[in-house]
């Protein structure tokens, strides 16, 4: 049967988080759109992670180890202490479904300077904000222990859960579910454990 006009777009840079950077929504001219991505038959997703990155910088004091008593501050050890303050069950290897996490992606360290690079992910906005607050409070605790400015945390939000924008327009999701049923496919709503270009648009 007849249908409304369709628009199809390709975003080649989705996997590196830049697929939506040059996407001209006005020129695309659609009232709403769906992303077609890999997954199992019947998967329908309209929720993704809230995402942030965190860079933790630890400043130490390097002194000759032979005369280091009461004056050396080893940034690497404080970095390890910071990481140890984060819950062990909130790591990617211990989570699934709607469970969020903090993931240590990279670390570099010497006695004088150490850096930890994390990504923070959670579907729930309040839980997402609490995860970021934990980074701040861990740093505050260590600064109280070792001196102001020892630990710095730089947090940056990357993208948000598109569910917040979609929920007022659930007819879009229901239309997709009905289309799947019409094609003999049982829709299964699952959360995206990642991001998507749609969340950035």
Where are these regions (language model features)?
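Alpha-helical metal-binding/catalytic segments enriched in His/Glu/Asp
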Residues: 1-15, 54-58, 64, 69-89, ...
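Acidic/histidine-rich catalytic neighborhood of metal-dependent amide-processing enzymes
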Residues: 1-49, 91, 95, 99-105, ...
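Conserved strand-to-helix beginnings and helix N-cap segments that scaffold or border functional pockets
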Residues: 20-21, 69, 129-132
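Short, solvent-exposed amphipathic alpha-helical segments in soluble enzyme
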Residues: 24-27, 50-51, 73-74, 133-137
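Short, solvent-exposed loop/turn segments at secondary-structure boundaries
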Residues: 46-47, 68-70, 164-167
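Metal-dependent amide/peptide-bond hydrolase catalytic core
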Residues: 75-200
């Amino acid at each position: 049967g007849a249908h409304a006009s369709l628009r199809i777009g390709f975003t080649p840079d989705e996997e590196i988080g830049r697929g939506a950077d040059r996407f001209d929504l006005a020129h695309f001219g659609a009232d709403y759109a769906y992303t077609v991505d890999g997954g199992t038959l019947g998967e329908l997703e309209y929720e993704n992670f809230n995402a942030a990155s965190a860079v933790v910088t630890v400043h130490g004091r390097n002194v000759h180890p032979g005369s280091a008593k009461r004056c050396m501050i080893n940034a690497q050890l404080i970095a390890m202490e910071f990481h140890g303050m984060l819950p062990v069950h909130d790591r990617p290897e211990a989570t699934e479904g709607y469970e969020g996490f903090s993931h240590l992606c990279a670390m570099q360290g010497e006695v004088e300077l150490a850096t930890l690079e994390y990504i923070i992910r959670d579907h729930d906005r309040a839980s997402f904000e609490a995860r970021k607050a934990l980074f701040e409070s861990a740093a505050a605790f260590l600064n109280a222990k070792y001196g102001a400015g020892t630990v710095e945390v730089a947090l940056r939000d990357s993208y948000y859960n598109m569910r917040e924008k979609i929920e007022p327009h659930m007819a879009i999701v229901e239309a997709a579910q009905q289309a799947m049923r019409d094609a003999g496919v049982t829709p299964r709503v699952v959360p995206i454990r990642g991001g998507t270009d749609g969340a950035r648009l």
